Amino acid sequence: PHKEVLGIPYDTPILGYLNNTANTLRLWRAEAPESFDFGVFNRGDYYGAVDHKISSENITKVLYPNDEAIEGKALRLEQQFFLVSASLQDMFRILDRQNIPVERFHEKFAAQMNDTHPALAVCELMRLLVDERHVPWDTAWEITQKSLAYTNHTLLPEALEQWPLALFSRLLPRHLEIIYEINDRFLEQVRVRYLGDPERVGRLSLINESGHRAVRMANLACVGSHAINGVAAMHSELVRTDL
């Protein structure tokens, strides 16, 4: 990987109301594996010796930075990936500790994606299963869909995130490869079901090909989930018909 970051967990107990139940809210802070690079320092780059520490900690310093500039967009994408990857890898850690086969991941865990901010969970879970655990693609896809659910809170365009392809490929090249593969398989099913309807194929694609090419995160979340809903019955119907 181009950059390695440590995810440091912080747990807060959440007490139930008038019962003996307490759940755990786990939040994450980003840190660099090494706080000081002596090799860079000894080459005379004194500020560069702490660059990795600063850039790593910036990931969780300020949530949702201004994304008008490309630097803000990049930091937002890093934040979303950090949350998703740290949480999913933590689930695999628990799975291993309890000696549960990876094929039963979906029996132990359910991940709820509220809006598109955590939608990278689809391709990151596939990466962890296929690349790290060597699970066959079809089995990994079944586990992924059974593990994930998506709630859409609004259909306003600004809430349906689309990441520029150039930025996505620079920061998450392997994940983009996985998205391409998911998209190819999904669109093949669409073409079979809706013969002679290229407009529908283009609308449902995970990649927006009009203008500046971009990854449609809402489409990715829908395709990778076993359950999709809105915040009300009417909203759920709009998600079904419009999204």
Annotate each PLM feature.
Residues 1-243:
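A conserved ligand/cofactor-binding region detector
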